[in-house]
Amino acid sequence: MRNTERPEAASEPDLKKRTKAVALRILKLVDAMPKTTAGRALASRIVRSGTSVAANYRAACRAKSTADFIAKMGIVEEEADQTLFWLELPEESELVTAGKLPAIKQEANELIAITVASIKTARRNRSSHSALRIPNSALE
């Protein structure tokens, strides 16, 4: 993140690549899912939430303020968690073979952990910066 008012989390280019890679893997996964009613319904949900993680992370990287960054990263966290949920269902309902999903589910878990850590860091940095302000100062 180039704006010095926003927190520096994990490497921005790396996370952009990772979130986009997950989106691409999801697109390939859903093409391999059965064309049943359940398969199509789950595929649609997985595509929406899984690609949304990458799109919303890109938006967070362009946040105008720390508050905006935190809000956008909250959306990334929610979408990543929903993606994980939707990825669990095809495996548990035996729509896909058990070995197809562990790697992508692991990556989703890692992205959630990174996102949560980034949000916590941003909140902590915001709090420490506001503590440095002098109350009722003419400089504020």
List PLM regions with ranges.
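Amphipathic alpha-helical assembly/interaction segments
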Residues: 1-140
